[in-house]
């Protein structure tokens, strides 16, 4: 399957891990999707989920200056996860920032409120500079 679908699954895994009642490990959360999606790029999913979870404070510090009158904690959970994922991938992969940003916008359109993709795109545009 495509990298795009792997990003969707990484997002859903991170969302699951963010639930207050969740005591799942990263590997346990990822294992839930393996049985139903054997063609996904699980190496990429694990890299992205582990990277985001392992670097949350640094990612939040990177994102925060561009939030304009917002804090990370006030963002919708979906937006916070998407920003962290995209920021991590922009900073730690060879994938062109433009591709990562486009995928983040598409995730936002799929999982967040109607116009939030504009906000996500604006924040990521500043981060990639």
Swiss-Prot record:
It comes from the Bacteria. Keywords: RNA-binding, Transcription, Transcription antitermination, Transcription regulation. The keyword Transcription regulation applies. Involved in transcription antitermination. Required for transcription of ribosomal RNA (rRNA) genes. Binds specifically to the boxA antiterminator sequence of the ribosomal RNA (rrn) operons. SUPFAM superfamilies: NusB-like. One of its GO terms (biological process) is transcription antitermination. Disulfide bonds: none annotated. HAMAP family: NusB (MF_00073). PANTHER family: ANTITERMINATION NUSB DOMAIN-CONTAINING PROTEIN, N UTILIZATION SUBSTANCE PROTEIN B-RELATED. This is Transcription antitermination protein NusB. GO terms for cellular component: cytosol. Gene3D superfamilies: NusB-like. GO terms for molecular function: RNA binding. Belongs to the NusB family.
């Amino acid at each position: 399957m495509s990298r795009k679908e792997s990003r969707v699954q990484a997002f859903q895994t991170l969302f699951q891990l963010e639930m207050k009642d969740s005591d799942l490990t990263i590997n346990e959360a990822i294992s839930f999707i393996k049985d139903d999606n054997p063609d996904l790029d699980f190496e990429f999913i694990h890299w992205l989920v582990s990277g985001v979870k392992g670097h949350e404070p640094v990612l939040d510090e990177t994102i925060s200056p561009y939030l304009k009158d917002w804090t990370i904690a006030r963002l919708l959970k979906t937006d916070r996860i998407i920003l962290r994922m995209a920021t991590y991938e922009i900073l730690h992969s060879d994938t062109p920032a433009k591709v990562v940003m486009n995928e983040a916008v598409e995730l936002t359109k799929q999982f967040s409120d109607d116009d939030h993709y504009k906000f996500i795109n604006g924040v990521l545009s500043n981060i990639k500079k």
